[in-house]
From Swiss-Prot:
Protein name, as recorded: Phosphate import ATP-binding protein PstB
Keywords per UniProt: ATP-binding, Cell inner membrane, Cell membrane, Membrane, Nucleotide-binding, Phosphate transport, Translocase, Transport
Family stated for the protein in its record: Belongs to the ABC transporter superfamily. Phosphate importer (TC 3.A.1.7) family.
Residue ranges annotated for the ABC transporter domain, each copy included: 14-255
Major location category of this protein: membrane
Pfam families membership: ABC_tran
């Protein structure tokens, strides 16, 4: 059972200002302006190809890895523009972590999957690493299931366990924000329920932005929802308002299933 959502704080942690993104000559994002509240869950919904995953990747500069990308506008994280020339991209990706659609554990043990990030960032003490591994797995609701087999290959876990492992791996490097790109689309309903409950619990300590095609999921877990269409945000508001009293005709048509 997914617990009731708590109200988020009113502190802004991420804000985009007139954000545009081009793939060569194609404009994939058009004048995106949105404020993300600290310790909130924001859902990004919309039809395939609408720009929601592209937008998600602008928030920790994952789109930098794609050839031919051009960005205009600002993404302000904790008061600083992440696209400024002197911004530390590695530190950005530590503070704004990413969980992908398909679970992608490393081909190594459960323990090494979690300790890998902290080691890369300079943690060498075995006792400290043990503590990070345990706490990260507890936060991701996986510890009780794997504590007696930490040296087992991570690929031996079920799909749902692998996704929670990937979340634990993200938590191990102490992010402030967690980006999730359809994290349950490849999972069965029971595993999906566990991930949703985990996401709501994580909101107490982290800010979460999730892309989902599942509007029921957005309604269950998110505080605010942004509806994307053709590279634009058509509407963004508290989730209950957007689903039950949309202000935009296109939003109403989408959530009622008239297109998608």
């Amino acid at each position: 059972m997914v617990k009731e959502k708590d109200k988020p704080k009113n502190e802004i942690i991420i804000e985009t200002e007139n954000l545009n993104l081009f793939y060569t000559d194609f404009k994939a994002l058009n004048e995106i302006n949105i404020k993300i509240l600290k310790n909130s869950i924001t859902a990004l919904i919309g039809p395939s190809g609408c720009g929601k995953s592209t937008f998600l990747r602008t928030l920790n500069r994952m789109n930098d890895l794609v050839e031919g990308i051009k960005i205009e506008g600002n993404v302000i994280y904790e008061g600083k523009n992440i696209y400024s020339n002197n911004f530390d991209i590695l530190e950005l990706r530590r503070k704004i972590g990413m969980v992908f659609q398909t679970p992608n554990p490393f081909l190594m043990s459960i323990y090494d999957n979690i300790s890998y990030g902290p080691k890369i960032h300079g943690t060498k003490d075995k006792k400290k690493l043990d503590e990070i591994v345990e706490q990260s797995l507890k936060k991701s609701a996986l510890w009780d299931e794997v504590k007696d087999k930490l040296n087992t290959n991570a690929l031996s876990l079920s799909g749902g366990q692998q996704q929670r492992l990937c979340i634990a791996r993200t938590l191990a490097i102490e992010p402030n924000v967690i980006l999730m790109d359809e994290p349950t689309s490849a999972l069965d309903p029971i595993s999906t329920g566990k991930i949703e409950e985990l996401i709501i619990n994580l909101k107490e300590s982290y800010t979460i932005i999730i892309v989902t095609h599942n509007m029921q999921q957005a309604g269950r877990i998110s505080d605010r929802t942004a509806f994307f269409l053709n590279g634009c945000i058509e509407e963004e508001s508290p989730t209950d308002e957007l689903f039950f009293n949309p202000k935009n005709t296109k939003t109403e048509e989408y959530i009622s299933g008239k297109f998608g």
